């Protein structure tokens, strides 16, 4: 088991604050869109209830989330993606490179569970791989 030095207990759960921040952005900017790959229901339930027309859930399809966000950005929307860090980068990496970076698409990506040690996996499911892929 990975030693966390009590980090999770010290940090607490930032999801409610993130939910409020996303609601504020949606309220202030009609072009704001939130896209998730099947995790926002747990992390941002109030946003989804309050702004259902500004929320897209691609299911367990990070590449689709990246492609959707890039397309929305190119059309003038302000998309943010919320998903597990490792899957955003490793499963969505080609979409980030080809459809966001090459196109100059203004997309923001929020990675959650960065330090969470997946018990069924090893290093490929922690933040180290995400950082390596994007660097």
What are these regions (language model features)?
Residues 1-135:
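Thiamine diphosphate
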């Amino acid at each position: 088991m990975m030693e966390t030095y009590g980090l999770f207990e010290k940090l607490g759960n930032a999801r409610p604050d993130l939910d409020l921040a996303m609601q504020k952005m949606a309220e202030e900017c009609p072009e704001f869109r939130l896209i998730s790959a099947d995790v926002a229901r747990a992390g941002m339930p109030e946003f989804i209830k309050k702004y259902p027309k500004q929320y897209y859930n691609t299911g367990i399809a990070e590449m689709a989330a990246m492609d959707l966000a890039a397309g929305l950005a190119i059309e003038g929307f302000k998309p943010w993606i919320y998903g597990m860090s490792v899957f955003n980068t490793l499963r969505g990496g080609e979409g980030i490179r080809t459809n966001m970076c090459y196109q100059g698409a203004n997309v923001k990506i929020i990675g959650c569970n960065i330090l969470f040690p997946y018990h069924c996996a090893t290093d490929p499911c922690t933040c180290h791989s995400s950082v390596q892929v994007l660097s």
